[in-house]
């Protein structure tokens, strides 16, 4: 209906223009006649709209004809540009990029397919999957088929399965490497432990506040070998002092002849001294709190300890001889000391010695007199100083008194306290606790006159200890 009305309006408008003749035109040749009616297409469309409408009609007509004829060939239409844009360079660049991307994709496809083909070629044909699905379906393997099979066929199948399992096991064993036998796969699941610097975790303790028991406990925990080394040091030093040094003196005196025995004593003496010096060095490290676990002194101590243990066999053999030599030396020393003790007895003094002693006494008396004079002189100096000090104090008090006469008068105690008209209170009222205590004491005194105090029995009569005898009379007769 709308199309028919539009056509009628257009026909009427064409008839009117034909009757009117030629219309006015502008400089560009555009028609300047009467405006179009609402029913005409030019009322709401311009030339661009007319062009697009004609193009869509042609496309629809062509498509309808192709559908009717059944022709499936696609025809390319030439498009006419309405508003041409200069997009040639950008199209070329886009086309080039697209071509490069396509080439890369093709290359990737070719590379992937080649790698896949190489991998498939390297795989053992017995391990590769088949190309047909039918091989893996519709088989007779199952409980029903087993019932129909004979015992020989079942045993043969079991043997084949066992062989196949052994082949798979060998193949897996060949694929194993050295890394598979380690614990790296376990360490991969382990939680990372945060590494803390020793300087951060080090706690400095005040050892002065720690008890002796705790100190020993800490010492045994940090270095258990320290106490053993200290005891060993004491033992070795006593052995060097009491046994080896006296024996070496006998060697130097020639009592012990030179030979293997003297060489053994010198070796043992040097070994013990070196061992003790290394222990003392170890104790110095411990006193300075230097870590000695990796120090070379530990290895040196171990070597010396091993050498001492080797000498223990010789010590057991020579222990009796060493004791005999030490006893002989002690006896000789005692014999030397006995005559010296006898010679220390007092002897009668001669006249010359007595006179010398008297002179010494007189000298001492002279010295004592000199000391007394020095003391008296010192006391006099002290008295003079005290007198001067007193004079200075008296002079200062007089000067202050003269100054105070001209100065202002000091305030009194009453002015300083500023108590005003407050009433006078007793001294006992200052402390309530003492006040109530005194009150309680006086109340107890008053109560003694009102109520008699309870007196407990001190000792109850328990009868005569030896019984009462009727014949004994202890009364006094009146005369």
From Swiss-Prot:
Compositional bias segments (type: Low complexity): 11-21
InterPro entries: Sas10/Utp3/C1D (IPR007146), Sas10_C_dom (IPR018972)
Transmembrane regions listed in the UniProt entry: none
GO cellular component: nucleolus; nucleoplasm; nucleus; small-subunit processome
Modified residues (Phosphothreonine): 362
Keywords: Acetylation, Chromatin regulator, Citrullination, Developmental protein, Isopeptide bond, Methylation, Nucleus, Phosphoprotein, Ubl conjugation
N6-acetyllysine sites (modified residues): 144
Record bears the keyword Nucleus: yes
Biased composition annotated in UniProt, kind: Acidic residues: 69-111, 153-165
GO terms of biological process kind: brain development; chromatin organization; maturation of SSU-rRNA from tricistronic rRNA transcript (SSU-rRNA, 5.8S rRNA, LSU-rRNA); ribosomal small subunit biogenesis
Chief site of localization: nucleus
Keyword Phosphoprotein: yes
Entry's Gene Ontology molecular function annotations: RNA binding
Quaternary structure and interacting proteins, as annotated: Part of the small subunit (SSU) processome, composed of more than 70 proteins and the RNA chaperone small nucleolar RNA (snoRNA) U3.
Name of this protein: Something about silencing protein 10
Source organism of this protein record: Homo sapiens
Taxonomic placement: Eukaryota, Metazoa, Chordata, Craniata, Vertebrata
Gene of this entry: UTP3
